[in-house]
Regions:
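Basic, polyanion-binding surface patches
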Residues: 1-186
Length: 186
């Protein structure tokens, strides 16, 4: 087991080590308009029902669309979409139609109004479950009401944000410690 020599580190940069899961694309629809935003701040909050907490900045165009419609689609892109994902994050849906500008295909969702992004590996249709944290923290708690996941590959290469413009691609999967794992402890 390794021991590490440590130095002081700026607390505002700890996100580099704690960023949650993969970067996702949140698609939304309201009053005849659609939008896509890039999001890295999300977390699983419950297994059943599947609840996902999502931080959306109040200055973001998607914030108002999601707040008003009370629903969205969380789309999981793979590494081959990395450049597009970054470009989407650098533009505002107030100014452009992101689906057209970035050549992405909209597919109708089954249970919400926001469109699925067909080029993404997975699409999770979500309805707002709890808005009590929106005013104070800009955190929406969504319930996944319908999930669509590609059958292959089993573990796609996803994009993860490390902070300050640094990204990571998901790596090797291993079952090496599976025998130590106790699901009852979750």
């Amino acid at each position: 087991m390794s021991r590490y020599t440590k130095k002081d580190f700026p607390p505002h940069n700890v996100r580099r080590f704690l960023e949650p899961g993969p970067i996702v694309l949140v698609s939304s629809a309201h009053k005849g308009r659609t939008n896509i935003m890039t999001m890295g701040w999300h977390m699983m909050m419950e297994f059943s029902p599947s609840l996902v907490g999502c931080l959306i900045s109040s200055g973001n165009h998607s914030f108002e669309m999601v707040k008003a419609s009370r629903q969205c689609v969380i789309n999981v892109p793979t590494a081959d979409l990395a450049a597009t994902v970054v470009k989407i994050g650098n533009t505002s849906g107030r100014d452009i139609d992101k689906f057209k500008s970035f050549g992405l295909s909209q597919k109708p969702a089954e249970q919400v109004r926001g469109p699925l992004i067909d080029e993404c590996y997975a699409n999770f249709e979500c309805r707002l479950s709890d808005s009590s944290w929106v005013r104070k923290y800009n955190v929406f708690v969504f319930e996944v009401v319908k999930a669509h996941v590609a059958s292959s590959p089993k573990y796609p290469k996803t994009i993860h944000y490390r902070g300050d413009g640094e990204f990571m691609i998901s790596g090797e999967n291993t079952g090496r410690w599976r025998r130590l794992f106790r699901p009852g402890m979750l």
